[in-house]
């Protein structure tokens, strides 16, 4: 079992219950899922690009990503309905906790010119979204084997009712927010 999951069960639930005055353990916010999304618009011109993106995403997430396709044709972007334009992975359970641990302990500290995560990236319902400009911050990616630096979106979906509860939950997991 992941260290962060143990920490959540042992200390975070008690801390948040005390802070927000929850009467039941089920009221305490928890992380539901983590979604990784990589938009690969260049895949329209070159099919190999999508294969590389899928390989990187599989290495980072530890499970096979789903290819996302265009829903409608847009002439300005030279895409047609059904063209592959990205990939995404939804992590739940044990893989989610392991990814969260790697994200907080290894990947985020490796971001260039990092000054803390923005607290403005909460959506109003306790979910947190962040963007990563380079996939090479993850230790699973071999720098010599990548074809191009790509970014991705990481969305952490929680059961928190508002941003304050969501932030308290992520703070408990040592997320490095800007002060």
Curated annotation (Swiss-Prot):
Keywords: Ribonucleoprotein, Ribosomal protein, RNA-binding, rRNA-binding, tRNA-binding. One of its GO terms (biological process) is translation. Gene3D superfamilies: 3.30.1440.10. One of its GO terms (cellular component) is ribosome. The keyword Transferase does not apply. SUPFAM superfamilies: RL5-like. It holds the Pfam family Ribosomal_L5. The keyword Oxidoreductase does not apply. PROSITE patterns: RIBOSOMAL_L5. Transmembrane segments: none annotated. GO terms for molecular function: rRNA binding; structural constituent of ribosome; tRNA binding. Part of the 50S ribosomal subunit; part of the 5S rRNA/L5/L18/L25 subcomplex. Contacts the 5S rRNA and the P site tRNA. Forms a bridge to the 30S subunit in the 70S ribosome. Belongs to the universal ribosomal protein uL5 family. This is one of the proteins that bind and probably mediate the attachment of the 5S RNA into the large ribosomal subunit, where it forms part of the central protuberance. In the 70S ribosome it contacts protein S13 of the 30S subunit (bridge B1b), connecting the 2 subunits; this bridge is implicated in subunit movement. Contacts the P site tRNA; the 5S rRNA and some of its associated proteins might help stabilize positioning of ribosome-bound tRNAs. This is Large ribosomal subunit protein uL5. It comes from Shewanella loihica (strain ATCC BAA-1088 / PV-4).
